[in-house]
């Protein structure tokens, strides 16, 4: 099945739709690339996402994430170790990880199927945090589904946030989808005004990230 085969609505809203099962899961299950901008990420959100996306392991699927620069301390420590091992095998012994989802996340990272960059505002006009909420699914036919509006990055069926998303497809609304794609690619290649985009490890080693034990997210 491809993205075009899905029966997608133009909008999903929590009071009348199951956003996760009706939109996110079908799109994730039928894409080969998923691009996402989000205000924050955690070990739990990434491990849940990659564990549920079976085709990322079976095919040459990939995920590109652009996140804001706030992290829970333990999340940042774990993510730094996982991505550091990808580049310097042997620094981090992944065998000590007991959580199956995190083990799967480690494998996805080591196989270069997950890339993470950090967006940091660098202008007096935009001096807070990066909070853009946009996503793009692409399938084997090069069809695209784009969306905006949700802060849910895990696509966990236990998510209880009230939210709504607007959906655009390349076969019905190509101009809007092209704008979303261009916006993401400009961010990814650091060509967007008012923000600077860095590789996760570079941002961490350059002390550009904000972190606190109070920004806690359960990783179990």
Question: Where is each model-derived feature located?
Answer:
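PLD/PLD-like phosphodiesterase catalytic module centered on the HKD motif
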Residues: 1-220
């Amino acid at each position: 099945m491809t993205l075009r085969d899905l029966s997608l609505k133009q909008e999903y809203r929590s009071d009348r739709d199951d956003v996760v099962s009706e939109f996110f899961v079908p799109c994730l299950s039928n894409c080969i690339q998923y691009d996402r901008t989000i205000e924050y990420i955690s070990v739990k959100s990434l491990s849940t996402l990659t564990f549920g996306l079976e085709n990322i392991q079976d095919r040459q699927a990939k995920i590109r994430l652009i996140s804001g620069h706030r992290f829970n301390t333990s999340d940042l420590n774990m993510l730094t170790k996982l991505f550091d091992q990808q580049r310097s095998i042997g620094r981090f012994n992944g065998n000590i990880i007991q959580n199956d989802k995190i083990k799967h996340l480690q494998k996805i990272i080591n196989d270069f199927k997950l890339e993470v960059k950090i967006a940091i505002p660098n202008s007096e006009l935009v001096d807070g945090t990066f909070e853009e909420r946009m996503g793009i699914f692409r399938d084997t036919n090069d069809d695209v589904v784009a969306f905006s509006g949700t802060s849910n990055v895990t696509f966990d069926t236990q998510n209880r946030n009230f939210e709504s998303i607007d959906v655009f497809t390349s076969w019905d609304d190509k101009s809007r989808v092209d704008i979303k794609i261009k916006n993401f690619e400009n961010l990814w290649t650091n060509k967007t005004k008012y923000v600077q985009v860095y590789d996760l490890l570079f941002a961490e080693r350059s002390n550009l990230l904000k972190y606190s034990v109070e920004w806690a997210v359960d990783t179990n």
